[in-house]
A protein has these predicted regions:
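N-lobe entry segment of adenylate-forming
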Residues: 182, 201-216
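Short amphipathic alpha-helical segments
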Residues: 2, 60, 64, 158-160
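His-Asp-centered acyl/peptidyl-transfer active-site segments
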Residues: 7-20, 30-136, 166-170, 194
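Hydrophobic pocket-lining residues that define ligand/cofactor binding sites across diverse proteins
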Residues: 8, 27, 188
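Extended, hydrophobic beta-loop-alpha segments that form or line the acyl/peptidyl-thioester binding
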Residues: 34-41, 69-78, 96, 139-202
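Flexible, P/S/T/G-rich "lid" or insertion loops adjacent to the active sites of thioester-utilizing
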Residues: 1-13, 104, 201-208
Length: 216
């Protein structure tokens, strides 16, 4: 993870934008849609609490739109998502929840949902993580959420948890999604992999070659 973090820094993007884009790659691989939205959950601690010991729910949501182009190099997509996140932060008071409400005001989009969630706790104390972690009982009580990919760093190691609705995904598919995420992530120990197109990334032989080089 330390090597991957170094490469992320070299590209000039944040760890959160990188990891949520990896999720987009996985979803695109298993989906017939090349355009979709991920509901990004982040910690948004108000400035007046930054240096305090106050523990509370400071979560914020942002709807990230992805348009996956098969011949597009990954680093180009990554830079675009990074810029999109920066621009969205300028409107952080208008949260993803409020955007969803506005979308549903359209009669044709009344049932619109954004069921794929990415929860980033990077940079958050472990004691605070429980406030932004969507537990299994939360998923069972929130039918509009099908998946929550949660990431955090503990003792310099990246922890990834896929919280999936049991009635929405087969066990085989759930395992495949988690495995794809892990395999794709590990490929980025090689800085050159950021230059791969999405089509090349979805090539299992290409991925296996990179992973084999990593293990050598």
């Amino acid at each position: 993870w330390s090597k991957i973090k170094s490469n992320i820094s070299e590209i000039g993007v944040t760890q959160t934008s990188f990891l949520v884009t990896i999720l987009a790659l996985v979803l695109n691989r298993w989906s017939s849609n090349s355009e979709f939205t991920i509901n990004l959950t982040t910690m948004n601690r108000p400035k007046e609490y930054i240096k305090s010991d106050v523990v509370n729910d400071f979560t914020s949501t942002e709807l990230l739109e992805f348009r996956m182009e098969s011949l597009q190099p990954f680093y180009v997509l990554l830079k675009h998502i990074q810029q999109q996140m920066i621009e969205d932060l300028q409107h952080e008071t208008f949260t993803g929840v409020e955007v969803t409400r506005e979308v549903r005001k359209n009669v044709e989009r009344r049932d619109a949902i954004f069921p794929f969630v990415f929860t980033s706790a990077l940079g958050i104390k472990a004691s605070e993580y429980k406030y932004i972690s969507l537990q299994k009982e939360g998923l069972s009580e929130t039918p509009q959420v099908l998946m929550d990919c949660q990431v955090m760093e503990v003792n310099h190691e990246l922890i990834i948890n896929f919280d999936l609705r049991a009635d929405a995904f087969s066990k085989e598919l759930s395992n495949s999604i988690a495995e794809d995420y892990s395999n794709l992530l590990n490929c980025f120990f090689d800085l050159e992999y950021f230059k791969k197109t999405l089509t090349e990334m979805y090539d299992e032989n290409e991925m296996n070659d990179v992973l084999a080089d990593k293990s050598d």
